[in-house]
Amino acid sequence: MTEEHRLISAESVTEGHPDKVCDQISDAILDDLLVQDPSSHVAVETSAATGVFLVFGEVTSKGYCDVQSKVRETLRNIGYTSSEVGLDADSCGVVVAITEQSAEINQGVARLTGDQETAASREERYEAQGAGDQGVMFGYATDETPTLMPLPIYLAHRLAFRLTEVRKSGEVPHLRPDGKTQVTIEYDDNDKPVRLDTVLISTQHDPEVTQDWLAVELKKHVIDPVLDEVLGSKVPHDNYRQLVNPTGSFILGGPAADAGLTGRKIIVDTYGGAAHHGGGAFSGKDPSKVDRSAAYATRWVAKNIVAAGLAHKVEIQIAYAIGVADPVSVNVETFGTEQGVTRGQIAAAVRKVFDLRPAAIIDELDLKRPIYLKTAAYGHFGRTDVEFPWEKTDKVEELKAAIAAE
C-alpha cells in the first residue's frame, strides 16, 4: 500500500446481537401500534440482560400492544428458542414500564387533532406539525456502489445478512444467533476502492464446532458468495486476510454474554463511519421524531443528488427546533466532487425540490406504516432485500430541472 492510499473499515452485526435484539423489539412494538393507529406517538426503549428484558418509554396511541407477547415473538423469530443458545423466548423475564407521552412535548407536535386535522389543508397540516425534538441529522450517498452506499458498510451488511441466512436455512449447521462482521477496504488517493484488505467474522456456535471447520464453512458459504456478488471483478479480492472468531470459541452469546440496549448501534445503522452522525438513534421511534424521519429524508435527498450525477458523493446536514416545522438549517457538502455545477446550485435546488418539514416528510415517504422492524437489522440504508421509500430516486429530474432553471 502506498503512502497516498488508506484503509477504511466498517462493521455490521447480525439480528442476534444483543443491541440489535433490543432494536428489533422496540421496532416490533412500534409496528404493532402503527397497524392499529398510524398516528401513534411512540418512543420505546428496550434493555436486555441475562434472561430478562426491560421495555420502557412513552406511548400515546389508540392501539394496544401486548408487549410481553411481542418480545417473545421477536426473540423466537431471531432464533433464541432454548437455554442452550443462551436465551429461551418462552421463559425469559419481561418487565414493562411504558407511560404516556409528555403533554408538553405533544403540544408542539400535534397542534391539530380530530376534526381540525381532517378539515385542514395540506399546507396547514405541514405548518402545524413541529419537530418532535431539537437535533441535527445527516444523510449521505456515494457512487462507489450500485446502492449508493459506502463499500465497507455495504459489504459488512451483506456478510452479516448472509451469515444469518445460512444459520436459519441450516446450510451451515451449528451456528447460533449472535454474530458480527467487519470489512477493511483499501482506497486510493482519489477515494476509489481498489482492494479488499480484511474480512472478519465472529459468530456464535455450538460447543462441538472446531474453529478450523468453521473457517472453511464460512468461507465457502458466506464469504466467497458475498464477495463474488458485491465485488465481482470491480475490486480485487484474491489476496485478503480472513479472520474468523480470532479469540477462539464463541459459544455463549446474545444477552447472556453481553447486555443489550436500543440505539447502541447507530453507526452500523447508517454509513459505517463514512459520514457524520447527529447522535439520535432510530428504533422504537415513530416518524414524528425527526431523529428518524429526518435522517431518512436526508438519505433520500443525498441519494437523489448522486443519482442525478450532480456529485460523486454528498452529505446533507439538517437541524430542527422542537415544535417548529421548518428546519433551522440545511447544509449540502459535496467534498469537491460536484459535476458541472456548484455546491451552491445544488443547495438551492434541494431547497426548491424537497419540503423537509416533518409532516411533509411523513407524507412524501409514507412513514406512518408498519415498516420499521425490517430496518432494525442489517442497516436502514442501501438494502437490496427490502424496499424502503427513502431509497427511491424519484427527484432526479426535478433536481436537474431546478438547476437548469437557475
Swiss-Prot record:
ATP binds at H17, D178, G179, K180, D258, R264, K265, A281, K285. The keyword Transferase applies. It comes from the Bacteria. Residues 101-111 are annotated as: Flexible loop. One of its GO terms (biological process) is S-adenosylmethionine biosynthetic process. Pfam families: S-AdoMet_synt_C (PF02773), S-AdoMet_synt_M (PF02772), S-AdoMet_synt_N (PF00438). L-methionine binds at E58, Q101, D258, K289. Keywords: ATP-binding, Cytoplasm, Magnesium, Metal-binding, Nucleotide-binding, One-carbon metabolism, Potassium, Transferase. Its cofactor is Mg(2+); K(+). One of its GO terms (molecular function) is magnesium ion binding. SUPFAM superfamilies: S-adenosylmethionine synthetase (SSF55973). Catalyzes the formation of S-adenosylmethionine (AdoMet) from methionine and ATP. The overall synthetic reaction is composed of two sequential steps, AdoMet formation and the subsequent tripolyphosphate hydrolysis which occurs prior to release of AdoMet from the enzyme. Belongs to the AdoMet synthase family. HAMAP family: S_AdoMet_synth1. This is S-adenosylmethionine synthase. It comes from Bifidobacterium longum subsp. infantis (strain ATCC 15697 / DSM 20088 / JCM 1222 / NCTC 11817 / S12).
